[in-house]
């Protein structure tokens, strides 16, 4: 936040929309009317998946999001999720809505723990301090965690990673060239190798 950069890649459209001058008249998407992106450079670069990951050995025998929803209702699980101000937390809230789960009631029942970002959630799962966590496929891959289920688009929408060159870039030509490179087959093969799906 408030750092200079040439290219911005977000884990959700919401954060990109808040900087997109073409949306400055849409107060829901760009509430502060910011115009920080270089026109015509925004693309939907990658898709990630929201997954349900478990620690080594899967001690609670969690099989799926359906199974997790039942365990949450019964108070028989400890789930790590992202805070509501980060994309992974926002996707998790959509999953709760899909299953008609009340997050506040679950938190009050002591079956939720929070992380301020997806890395913190991933660490809780990796260390086995929780029974499972909602994290991205790429984070599960990086941490070597077992994924027992992937959320569908119906459950939480698509996890789109938009990218754009910043208007205040000190190197706009190089930034655009880099963004173009990220869209090549060569770059996409690298992204796919760690769990992303290409959008371009």
Can you name each region flagged by the protein language model?
Residues 1-4, 12-21, 41-48, 54-200:
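Exported/periplasmic ABC-transporter solute-binding proteins
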Residues 24-36:
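Surface-exposed intrinsically disordered loops and tails
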């Amino acid at each position: 936040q408030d750092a200079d950069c040439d290219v911005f890649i977000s884990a959700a459209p919401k954060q990109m929309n808040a900087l997109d001058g073409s949306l400055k008249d849409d107060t829901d998407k760009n509430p502060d009317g910011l115009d920080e992106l270089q026109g015509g450079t925004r693309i939907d670069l990658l898709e990630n998946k929201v997954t349900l990951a478990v620690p080594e050995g899967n001690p609670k025998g969690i099989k799926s999001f359906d199974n997790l929803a039942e365990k949450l209702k019964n108070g028989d699980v400890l789930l790590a999720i992202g805070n509501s101000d980060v994309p992974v937390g926002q996707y998790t809230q959509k999953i709760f809505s899909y299953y008609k789960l009340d997050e506040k009631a679950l938190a009050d029942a002591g079956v939720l723990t929070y992380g301020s970002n997806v890395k913190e959630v991933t660490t809780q799962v990796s260390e086995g301090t929780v029974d499972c966590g909602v994290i991205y496929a790429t984070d599960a891959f990086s941490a070597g965690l077992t994924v027992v289920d992937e959320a569908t688009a119906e459950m939480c929408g698509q996890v789109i990673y938009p990218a754009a060159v910043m208007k205040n870039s000190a190197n706009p030509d190089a930034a655009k060239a880099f963004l173009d490179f990220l869209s090549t087959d060569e770059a996409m093969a690298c992204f796919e190798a760690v769990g992303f799906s290409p959008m371009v």
